[in-house]
């Protein structure tokens, strides 16, 4: 996967004491995405906007809005609507792209 002709935020977005690190990418259309990595941990994300999380590498074990945990691997994705949440468990580094909206 590759994004062409984009603007990349120089400063990293660092969450959960460094367990989740990403950079914001803005496409020519103005659409924003973030490209990042989640290090081994279990984290909860509460969402104010809809997100589609796409796994690029690794395995993410995800519970959406309290549902049973599901494993997602490279090339798979999950969607959470605004106002929802997901809990992600990473046993090894999980590389991802977050598509907003």
Predicted regions located by residue number:
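A short, N-terminal "cap"/entry segment at the start of jelly-roll beta-barrel domains
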Residues: 1-31
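Short solvent-exposed loop/turn micro-motifs enriched in small/polar/acidic residues
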Residues: 16-18, 38, 45-47, 71, ...
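Compact, glycine-rich, soluble single-domain proteins
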Residues: 21, 25, 36-45, 62-64
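General beta-strand recognition
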Residues: 33-34, 44, 61, 87, ...
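A structural signal for the main folded, soluble domain(s) of proteins
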Residues: 41-44, 49, 84, 101
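Short, conserved beta-strand element in jelly-roll/cupin
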Residues: 48-62
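Short acidic-glycine-tyrosine-enriched beta hairpin
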Residues: 65-86
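Ligand-binding loop in jelly-roll beta-barrel domains
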Residues: 81-101
């Amino acid at each position: 996967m590759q994004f062409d002709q984009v603007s990349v935020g120089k400063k990293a977005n660092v969450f959960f004491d460094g367990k989740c690190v990403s950079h914001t990418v803005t496409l020519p259309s103005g659409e924003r995405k973030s490209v990042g990595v989640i290090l081994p941990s279990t984290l909860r994300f509460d969402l104010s906007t809809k997100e589609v999380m796409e796994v690029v590498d690794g395995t993410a074990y995800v519970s959406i809005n309290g549902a049973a945990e599901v494993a997602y691997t490279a090339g798979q994705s999950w969607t959470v609507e605004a106002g929802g949440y997901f809990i992600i468990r990473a046993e090894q580094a999980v590389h991802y792209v977050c598509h907003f909206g």
